[in-house]
Amino acid sequence: MKSFLDLERALFEQLADMENKLLPKLTELRADPIIASFVHELYSYAMDKDGNVKYSRLLQKIDRTTANALQNMQQELLEELADDVYAEVRGEYPLSVTAFDQLNRIDAVKAIYGMTDLKMAMREAKLIREHFDVWADTVFAMVETFYGIKSLSKISVQHNFEPQLYHQRLTAGLEAGKRLSLDVLRAMPVERAVEDITRYMEKKDKQVTDRIVFTEGTTVTEEVSVEVVKTRVKAFHTVSVKDGKTCADCKAIEAEQAANPVPIENYAPGVTAPPFHPYCRCWIDFVEVVR
């Protein structure tokens, strides 16, 4: 069986392949005057000079006809690819494939593939939901699933847990993602949101699990153990997509912050944290310390 990190790596590679397959069709879509106008307004003027999202005012300019046209075309394109892209993950681990199967618009692909900052993604999701209910929970599902996958990848590096515990940890991660959604929608500062999620996850980290150890083909069940881990977020560092497309500047920032993580109180999108440019292919990972 492949490790979760292998599957995560394969997922990003397949998503990159999906993007390459979509590019010719995206070019055709954006050649349409209505679509081109939508993309131009949404991405070129989404942020003001202070980094504040201006989707609310911009999206009011775009009528329901445009929204429906986009949704219908993107639904057709993405349904063709969704099953193949996630077949390997679906077959190996009990991930929440419902979120992946909701890939019904190009923006959702960008959300899971190039997610840079959870706070920004959730703010975008809230504003899109307000104006285009036809897209409903897509971005929310992407953020929640992504948060769960990140928590799983951390566990897989540190511990030799079995798949059933992966599933428990993913469930906790998805629940934490939903809680983070509420924190961000209440405009809670990112530091407080992180503290809130940390406290929430501390409760989830008390786990009673039957450890199964495989030795020379024999299955041995150990005694039930109680494990309590209390952590707090101390800092963060930038992580980029490993597919050869990340720019040199982002790679340099990633290397620098890997060696010297940034204190959480210095979190500043565009300065110390992604996005560093409009199509930034980075996100952040938290550094946790045991209390």
Which sequence ranges carry the predicted segments?
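N-terminal leader/targeting and assembly helices and adjacent pre-domain segments
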Residues: M1-K204, V220, E288-R291
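Acidic, glycine-rich two-metal-ion catalytic cores of nucleic acid-processing enzymes
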Residues: T198-R291
